[in-house]
Amino acid sequence: MKLALSLILFAAWIVSVGPARAETIKIGVVPGAYADSVEALIPEAKAEGLDVKLVEFSDWTTPNVALQAGDIDLNYFQHKPFLDNAIAQRGYDLVPVGVGILSNIGIYSLKHKDFASVPNGALVAIANDPVNQGRGLLLLQRGGLIKLKDGVGFKGSIDDIIDNPKHVTFKEVEGPQLVRITPDVDLALGYPHFIVAAKAFDPSSGLIYTGIDDKQFAIIFTARRDRADSPALKKIVEIYHRSPKVKEAISKAFANDPKLYTLAW
């Protein structure tokens, strides 16, 4: 009887001190390199007591809304200038907690082989958010298609164009949707990882690209300010930076072409 009671008590003790329940971390992402690379860290995070759940979004507004509301713990889809603009517009209390991929963006055309071939009155698709629109316009300026007011930098908009010799017109599109509209326009701003994910066309066929000089546009892990010092969130970023599986997923998401991205950490 004493032996049976001892076994019962021992079993109860084992249950009470058994494996700690994994902490669930919900990370908001958009499809492509960001989702794929975060998904790659899930097994390593699980081994360290973190149960990572991906929440995919199809736009660039909802991930910050969801984060501010506490529906997710992190998001990973935006760069610092984009976050700064969102905070200024919406009053979010969000902060960066880690840096990730620097995605080099490009100008693509399925109709013209270079900027010189672009006809008068051409239609150009460009991002509709303030920061990424400015980045696209700077690329078009580098390509000789337009000229912007001095000093506007990446904060420039279509209204800041002061010279447009070919009288091109612009179609403003939500960033993730640019890949779908590319066949229907003369030129389009493009994000290589979205192009790869959509299997739309060759992501290495851009007429011009941004580069490492654009490091301020590296994608960041973002959290609510009150959770910025969370050990679990810091661990996610640490695993992301060190994991070979993450690096493999990033390379694959960019068609294994190193000119399309940079590891910014």
Annotate each PLM feature.
Residues 97-147, 247:
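A conserved helix-loop-strand patch within extracytoplasmic ligand-binding domains
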Residues 23-32, 50-56, 123-124:
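Short, well-ordered beta-strand elements
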Residues 104-115, 217-232:
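A bilobed periplasmic-binding-protein/Venus flytrap-type ligand-binding module shared by bacterial periplasmic
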Residues 32, 56-60, 70, 74-84, ...:
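Beta->alpha turn/N-cap motifs
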Residues 85-97, 111-112, 184, 189, ...:
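Ligand-binding "clamshell"
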Residues 132-141, 240-261:
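Periplasmic-binding protein-like
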Residues 60-92, 106-108, 113, 136, ...:
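Pocket-flanking alpha-helical
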Residues 54-65, 152-180:
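Short helix-initiation/N-cap motifs at beta->coil->alpha
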